[in-house]
A protein has these predicted regions:
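Conserved helix-loop functional segments at active or binding sites
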Residues: 332-339, 365, 595, 670
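Solvent-exposed, polar/charged alpha-helical surfaces in well-ordered, non-transmembrane soluble domains
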Residues: 90-101, 211, 215, 219, ...
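Beta-lactam-recognizing serine transpeptidase/beta-lactamase-like catalytic domain environment
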Residues: 70, 76, 293-305, 318, ...
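Conserved, well-ordered alpha-helix/loop/beta-strand core segments that scaffold catalytic motifs
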Residues: 299-347
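Flexible helix-coil linker/hinge segments at domain or subdomain boundaries
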Residues: 670-679
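Membrane-proximal periplasmic segments of bacterial cell-envelope enzymes
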Residues: 1-280, 286-307, 340, 347-348
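A generic structural motif
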Residues: 83-84, 648-652
Length: 686
């Protein structure tokens, strides 16, 4: 009995002790989860999470029909991660030296943000955008320089050698390393330090790395390395290189501008072409995410604090299939001419939609491919024909006789002549002490006889336009040229030259030049000092064909969200100018251009044109043995849809330009298989 009582007391004691332990456990659990739960959870998150920038996708570019021109391709990036870097300098240096050896053995060039040259004699190199600002900030943070004494226009007070020496000491670099070896190591250490200084977690040092390299870097084999993802631009066409443009890291000279807009120092932006022009549309908005990791450092979950927003889809006015045709036609023409006379030459073509100003094609020869830009850079950059030069918008050329319709409109609209007025042309026009000759007189001593303005345009009679040009006056001719957009900005969103219309003020502003009244005569036929771009010529003809309504030339058609679900913006600017032209005056000029292709000097080339067209030839004197060839046209004649201009440097007055124009018209109005035109002998035309 006593044993039973003793057992009961023991059991009761054990039960009481167990209850006490259980109660203590629940009190502790209540305190941890309820009373201090939020606090402990926050501590846990801080200890096992990190914040990362989520780089979003740049918007894509399409043509007018929705055909992709520039897209994005996802790639793996090699990043230095400040959170994975060992705190011990020796350990970190050892890991980075192993990484350098691996990258060099694999032939991988990594991005080095330290603005010092790679080898002795060391010098500062601030060619990378933001590098000067970043170094100044770092020097101030280390108290190696006074902030007030630093600018982005001058080198820091430390010499390059002194900076390298201080960095070796700061990062505890092994003294046995050569300066060249140390330079590589401190470059990566500096990158980590600046990344941390800017309160960022990672910095990409190589892009588009291979899966094989990733396999070697996995499982923390190289402590500070993180494999990230980003996107690179993928070009779906070899055409339109001058128009599309490239993306690069922010140019040094524009860093302050982009900084104010919230760009990161390592952001990629449009460098030229529409990539630059439409940067605000194409730019996405990066996101932020909180990444949870386990004790081994592996990601176990993620929470987005700011969702990334991809850039918009920008539709251009270009028809890329047509653009490819125009570039091919232009190249074939030039290469055929060069094969015959062994003269190297450039060329350009511009095609504009009548009634809208939409640019359907801008072609420049020679050109280049954005797909192989880096591989071909040295060859293209040293090519004397300058493939990177966009002749269609930045090449300026004397218009030659393609300017004569402007002179005709100016004379008609001011009452100097009427559509029925005739002039007896005599081959040589005497003005003061000068004698100005018609091209026909120079050729065989002939004249065009008595003609009206329509016939004068058809046969391109210089004598006729000398006379009406003198009577109309240079100020009136220049005023109408400006109204047609010649010597004025076209409105195009990419860089262009404005060109110049001959005027007394302009000529007198040139050193060693002065105005003479005789220059009115040469300006009236498109010579003298007048210089215009192919795009200006095409848009002028579009204005003429459209009855005098001039629209700004433009490449933007519309902007939609990345998935094209919503319309963001659309080009809808009103006409830039409306020229009041009497219908009978307009008809007299347009009929002359039509007669040229029906029964004039280019009729041979237009007999296989699939559409009724009108045109004007031009020969632009350059002072050399061979003049530039200029040709403008529009079609269809009765309901104009497109206008074009073709310029071939040293192209002379041959029929190659007319043939080129016919091929371009056929390419637009028919399928590619039908886009053929007669290629005859290089007949003399004016």
């Amino acid at each position: 009995m006593d044993d039973k009582k003793q057992f009961s007391r023991r059991l009761l004691a054990i039960g009481a002790l167990f209850s006490l332990v259980l109660a203590a456990y629940f009190v502790t659990l209540f305190d941890a989860q309820i009373v201090h739960g939020a606090e402990y959870r926050a501590r846990s998150i801080r200890a096992n999470t990190k914040s990362e920038t989520v780089v979003t996708s740049r918007g894509i570019l399409t043509d007018r029909n929705g055909k992709a021109l520039v897209t994005n391709r996802s790639v793996y990036t090699l990043e230095l991660d400040t959170s994975l870097a060992p705190s011990d300098d020796a350990a970190l240096n050892k890991e980075l030296l192993r990484l350098i050896e691996l990258l060099e053995n694999r032939g991988i060039v990594w991005e080095d943000t330290l603005p010092l040259t790679a080898g002795a004699p060391f010098a500062y190199d601030f060619s990378v955008s933001g590098s000067h600002t970043a170094l100044n900030s770092y020097l101030v943070s280390k108290k190696w320089a006074d902030e007030d004494a630093l600018t982005t226009d001058t080198d820091p007070p430390l010499s390059p050698e002194a900076l390298l020496s201080r960095l070796r000491t700061e990062f505890k670099v092994d003294g046995e390393l050569t300066d060249a070896e140390a330079r590589k190591l401190v470059g990566l250490r500096y990158c980590l330090a600046v990344t941390k200084l800017n309160q960022l977690s990672t910095a990409a040092i190589a892009s588009d790395i291979s899966v094989e390299l990733i396999a070697e870097l996995k499982d923390g084999a190289y402590a500070p390395i993180h494999i990230g993802t980003s996107s690179v631009r993928e070009y779906q066409t070899d055409a339109a290189a001058h128009i599309l443009g490239r993306v690069t890291k922010i140019p040094r000279e524009r860093w302050n501008e982009y900084k104010e807009k919230g760009y990161a120092m390592n952001a990629y932006v449009g460098y030229d072409g529409v990539e630059l022009a439409f940067e605000d549309y194409l730019r996405g908005r990066n996101g932020r995410r909180i990444v949870e990791t386990n004790t081994a450092g592996k990601v176990t979950g993620e929470i987005y604090s700011v969702e990334p927003e991809p850039g918009n889809t920008v539709a251009l006015t270009l028809d890329i299939d047509f653009q490819e045709d125009v570039e091919r036609i232009l190249a074939e023409t030039v290469e055929s001419m060069t094969a015959e006379d062994d003269i190297d030459r450039g060329a350009a073509a511009a095609v504009v939609q009548v009634g809208t100003g939409e640019v359907l094609s801008l072609a420049s020869y020679p050109t280049f491919s954005l797909k192989t830009f880096n591989e071909d850079y040295t060859e293209n950059n040293t090519d004397p024909l300058q493939p990177f030069w966009n002749r269609a918008t930045q090449g300026t050329y004397a218009p030659g006789s393609t300017f004569k319709p402007v002179t005709a409109i100016a004379a008609l609209e001011t009452g100097i002549i009427t559509p029925k007025s005739t002039i007896l042309t005599k081959g040589v026009y005497h003005y003061g002490d000068w004698a100005y000759k018609c091209w026909l007189y120079n050729q065989n001593g002939g004249t065009h006889g008595r003609i009206d303005v329509t016939e004068a345009i058809k046969v391109s009679c210089n004598y006729f336009f000398y006379d009406i040009g003198r009577r109309t006056g240079i100020s009136t001719i220049a005023r109408y040229a400006s109204a047609f957009g010649l010597g004025e900005p076209t409105g195009i969103e990419i860089p262009e030259k404005i060109g110049v219309m001959t005027t007394p003020d302009y000529v007198n502003s040139l050193d060693g030049h002065y105005w003479t009244d005789g220059q009115t005569l040469t300006a009236a036929i498109g010579q003298s000092y007048s210089l215009f771009t192919p795009l200006q010529l095409a848009n002028y003809v579009a204005t003429l064909a459209g009855g005098g309504t001039r629209y700004n030339a433009h490449l933007l058609k519309e902007v939609r969200t990345y998935d094209s679900a919503e319309l963001v913006d659309v080009y809808d600017k009103p006409p830039a100018e409306i020229i009041d032209i009497e219908p009978e005056n307009l008809q007299a000029v347009l009929q002359g251009m039509r007669d040229l292709v029906v029964s004039g000097s280019v009729a041979y080339y237009f007999k296989d044109c699939v559409v009724d067209a009108a045109a004007k030839t031009g020969t632009a004197q350059t002072g050399g043995k061979v003049s530039n060839g200029v040709f403008v046209a529009f079609a269809p004649y009765d309901d104009p849809q497109i206008a074009l201009a073709v310029v071939i440097e040293k192209g002379g007055s041959g029929g190659a330009l007319a043939s080129t124009a016919v091929q371009i018209l056929n390419a637009y109005f028919t399928s590619v298989d039908e886009a053929k035109a007669v290629v005859g002998e290089n007949m003399l035309i004016q």
